[in-house]
Amino acid sequence: MSKQRVVVGMSGGVDSSVTAWLLKEQGYDVVGLFMKNWEDDDDSEYCSTRQDWIDVVSVADLIGIDVEAVNFAAEYKDRVFAEFLREYSAGRTPNPDVLCNAEIKFKAFLDHAMSLGAETIATGHYARVREIDGRFELLKARDHTKDQSYFLHRLNQAQLSKTLFPLGDIPKTKVREIAEQIGLPNAKKKDSTGICFIGERPFRDFLNRYLPTRPGPMKTTDGKTVGEHIGLAFYTFGQRKGIGLGGSKDGSGEPWFVAGKDIESNTLYVAQGHDHPWLLSRTLTAGNTSWVAGHAPEVGHACAAKTRYRQADAACTFGAAGANADPNALFSLHFADAQWAVTPGQSAVLYDGDVCLGGGIIEHAATAQPVTRQPQKAALLTAR
């Protein structure tokens, strides 16, 4: 009887390498696939694509699997990076990893894997998939400190039905131990923390290569001008570093934070103190939705949500975003406690315990001064 073929997305990192080894040990016919999705290889200081490929080949040789490379650079720039720039141009702060997973790792990659005769794909993400009566659920990883379901919430039933997450039940510390025990050449390689497929590099410098700077006034929440910003795209809600203000503008000594943007007047608003009212929200509206089950929760459903990665789950109530709004497409969340720096462009992801329900892109968060939190319109990719 032939073995079930699984194509593993291999990045050259420890997680995907251990994933491939575990599946080989479980008897699968494992093929490794290395995705190249960014062409800027000349920027060797920050882009380690060549070294990553070398690591993938070394790991494949050690564990005894075939491996190949595939170039999705065109798909990445069209489906992910173009949207990334559009959102920043509109003053929002997108999360490229969310879109990258939905459009590249679990769409372009999945399609290519199927063309290689795979029955399933696997990645080194920390999450779990559970099947109940032919329906699939996306669950948090057992190790909640490493859970990545937030980035995977846009996966649908078809994608989850063909996906394995072998690390979902394993603590990260154990994954490192396995890598060292079996002698993986990349066992001590640090985890990647840069933009999906682009790598680790000074973010402001990178963004400046693609978006023009448009300086404008920097004002306090009471309208006093305290400086000049270099362009709204280069700041995000809740940002503290890189504003260029000390802690003494009002004598309190508290740090300054980005608290709002007015796109029409090109004004950046700053507030002093972590818990300033402009930084706190109890209600948000989100659109561009994706639901794991194929439909939204019932209006009035009590659940939990994250408005940024690594945030603790926050109790909330799911609602429609208006009297005539379809909550499958546009929804609101009402939080029991005020949430800090809820940021347009980021994902609001809903949970029932460990079960990820899906979510949407934050459009608006109600604060003490809603004028700067009006929905910031951007041309969104319909494919997302």
From Swiss-Prot:
It catalyses: S-sulfanyl-L-cysteinyl-[protein] + uridine(34) in tRNA + AH2 + ATP = 2-thiouridine(34) in tRNA + L-cysteinyl-[protein] + A + AMP + diphosphate + H(+). InterPro entries: MnmA-like, MnmA-like_C, MnmA-like_central, MnmA-like_central_sf, Rossmann-like_a/b/a_fold. Keywords: ATP-binding, Cytoplasm, Disulfide bond, Nucleotide-binding, RNA-binding, Transferase, tRNA processing, tRNA-binding. The active site is at 100 (nucleophile), 196 (cysteine persulfide intermediate). Its EC number is 2.8.1.13. The record marks 125, 346 as: Interaction with tRNA. Transmembrane segments: none annotated. It comes from the Bacteria. Residues 95-97 are annotated as: Interaction with target base in tRNA. It is found in: Cytoplasm. Disulfide bonds join 100-196. Residues 146-148, 308-309 are annotated as: Interaction with tRNA. It is an enzyme of class 2 (transferase). One of its GO terms (molecular function) is tRNA binding. ATP binds at residues 9-16, 35, 124. Gene3D superfamilies: Adenine nucleotide alpha hydrolases-like domains (2.30.30.280), HUPs (3.40.50.620), Translation factors (2.40.30.10). GO terms for biological process: tRNA wobble position uridine thiolation. SUPFAM superfamilies: Adenine nucleotide alpha hydrolases-like (SSF52402). GO terms for cellular component: cytoplasm. Catalyzes the 2-thiolation of uridine at the wobble position (U34) of tRNA, leading to the formation of s(2)U34. NCBIfam families: PRK00143.1, trmU. Belongs to the MnmA/TRMU family. This is tRNA-specific 2-thiouridylase MnmA. It comes from Paraburkholderia phymatum (strain DSM 17167 / CIP 108236 / LMG 21445 / STM815) (Burkholderia phymatum). The lineage of its organism: Bacteria, Pseudomonadati, Pseudomonadota, Betaproteobacteria, Burkholderiales.
